[in-house]
Design a protein with these regions (language model features):
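N-terminal hydrophobic targeting signals that begin at the initiator methionine
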Residues: 1-2, 25
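Bacterial N-terminal signal peptides that target proteins for export
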Residues: 2-13
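Acidic/polar surface patches and capping/hinge elements
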Residues: 25-518
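C-terminal motif of bacterial Sec signal peptides marking the signal peptidase cleavage site
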Residues: 20-23
Length: 518
């Protein structure tokens, strides 16, 4: 009965996800018109006391007091809203409909789309070498970034963490200044979205726009015009809808930018910029593995491609110390000379030769390869569809997405540490007769990245919404198994990857238990 209930819960959750899910594409058009307007059951009015991630305190960056609502300047700001509303266009109505579902959700959608657009490995030069994208010259060929899974996981984490800290500061200053919402000052004012009882200064949407734009400009520098366009829409929506006056917006943008600067400074020194390594390092990794008597991994791309970010395991985590990463490292994989390895290789070959329609659907659904928002993005999409049904406040949205994405970044760090520590070959390297059913990633096999990401995500989401734990765990297992069914991973890769993800996810859960939000 328990297994049947778990199966039903999983299927229900998957159907819900598929009903809302739109795939990413190069036209930056991932949108979801079926989401309702944000109308939280609880505004979390005391969230200004929640534990920040990087800020030393919610008031680390000062915010000037607002102008009084009795001043002529404030009256002019009220009149600006009325002027917009008296001449509202269909385009402006569409902007309100789009952004009123919530800023955290919409920026997450936008980021997933940007990740998908830039998830393109560089094409080789005429001499067979591969150029590397450079943040110093992002418009060159190849464009920066190549948003592969580790890069994407880090990007989601930085943006989500910065948004969360920014909204904690916002809630703090709302409480400090207690400026009433415009409709409470002028009862003739229309409000075109659900009314909020929260103070209006500073605007939470403006803070989100301010902090997110600065992070996305760093992470996706060729997309600045589009990113700024979306931020301008978000600011305009709050004014036209009657939710905020101009000074609420201006203060929010200023505060968001200040907070972004602290995260940008951290990003500059977290080690991600040197994670690609160099030719000497790549050769050393192969030599070290061979010295143990094991078969070292090699790139199966033609021409041979440099390994993907072999030093990403050294990137600075938000929740784990380097010692914790090493302590969490999984046990060694089966020796390439062992009977267990031979059995697991044979199992992969059998799946390759006897692919069922059901297995192929599973492989395809969880592939998340080139041109997609990556496995971390897939779990962001799953979380978003479920969070919409929970009627969270904007700040609780930010908190939950931050917990998820911090764990996914740590999953990338821990998984890449294991991959390049063990340098284990792919099944089709050991047996070239194996035909893979999905793309072959350009990095070692052990442990599976999909499995680690999925284990971490399911652990965090199960804590956030315990009633859906069985469904989240079932999805993680299916995502993990899909890599073995696709003939690119051994069973040990998948099973140990899930376990590593669970360990990593629990570090985020431990933080959740003491962050003041529960």
């Amino acid at each position: 009965m328990k297994n049947k209930t778990k199966h039903i819960a999983y299927k229900s959750l998957l159907i819900l996800f598929m009903a809302f899910h739109f795939s990413c594409s190069d036209d930056l058009s991932e949108r979801n018109d079926q989401f309702p307007q944000l109308n939280p059951a609880n505004t979390d009015e005391f969230a200004g006391t929640w534990k920040t991630i990087l800020l030393a305190s919610p008031d680390e960056f000062p915010l000037d007091p607002p102008i009084a609502v009795t001043t002529p300047a404030y009256t002019r700001e009220i009149n600006e809203i009325k002027s917009y509303q008296n001449n509202i266009t269909q385009e402006q109505k569409d902007i309100i409909a789009y952004w009123s579902v919530g800023g955290v959700l919409r920026w997450n959608e936008i980021m997933r789309t940007l990740v998908a657009r830039h998830n393109r490995p560089p094409y080789q030069n005429e001499d067979g070498s591969y150029p590397a994208p450079s943040p110093a010259n992002p418009f060159a060929n190849p464009e920066f970034p190549f948003s592969n899974p580790p890069y994407a996981a880090r990007a989601y984490a930085y943006v989500s963490a910065a948004q969360y800290d920014a909204l904690i500061a916002t809630w703090h200053y709302k409480k400090v200044y207690n400026r009433p919402a415009p409709f409470m000052v002028d009862n003739t004012l229309q409000v075109l979205i659900p009314k909020s009882t929260l103070p209006s200064y500073p605007s939470e949407d403006a803070v989100l726009a301010g902090v997110t734009v600065e992070l996305l400009k760093l992470l996706f520098p060729t997309e600045i015009a589009f990113i700024q366009q979306k931020a301008d829409e978000e600011k305009l929506y709050r004014i036209i809808s009657g939710a905020n006056v101009r000074s609420d917006i201006d203060a929010g943008i200023s505060l968001g930018r200040k907070i972004a600067s602290k995260f940008i400074s951290r990003a500059a020194t977290d080690g991600a910029g040197t994670a690609i390594g160099n030719q000497a390092l790549w050769a050393q990794l192969e030599k070290q593995c061979a010295a143990t008597g094991e078969m070292p991994w090699k790139s199966l791309d033609i021409p041979t491609r440099p390994p993907m970010l072999p030093l990403f395991g050294n990137v600075k985590s938000f929740l784990m110390t380097p010692a914790m990463v090493i302590a969490s490292r999984p046990v060694p994989p089966p020796s390439t000379h062992s009977e267990q390895f031979a059995n697991e290789l044979a199992e992969v070959k059998a799946y390759s030769k006897n692919a069922s329609k059901k297995n192929m659907q599973m492989v395809t659904f969880w592939a998340d390869g080139v041109g997609t928002y990556t496995p971390p993005g897939h779990w962001n999409a799953i979380a978003a569809e479920i969070f919409v049904t929970q009627n969270y406040s904007e700040i609780r949205w930010a908190r939950n997405m931050a917990l998820l994405n911090l764990s996914l970044m740590d999953a990338a760090i821990s998984c890449w540490d294991a991959k390049y520590f063990y340098f284990n070959p792919r099944p089709c390297q050991m047996d070239p007769s194996i035909k893979t059913l999905t793309g072959i990633p350009n990095f070692p096999a052990y442990v599976s990245g999909h499995s680690t990401f999925s284990g971490a995500a399911a652990t965090v989401l199960s804590h956030i919404i315990p009633s859906k734990k069985d469904a989240f765990q079932a999805m993680a297992i299916e995502a993990s198994n899909s890599r073995m069914l696709g003939a690119i991973h051994y069973r040990s890769d998948c099973e140990k990857g899930l376990l590593l993800g669970n360990v990593v996810g629990n570090f985020a859960v431990l933080r959740a238990k003491i962050d003041g939000a529960e």
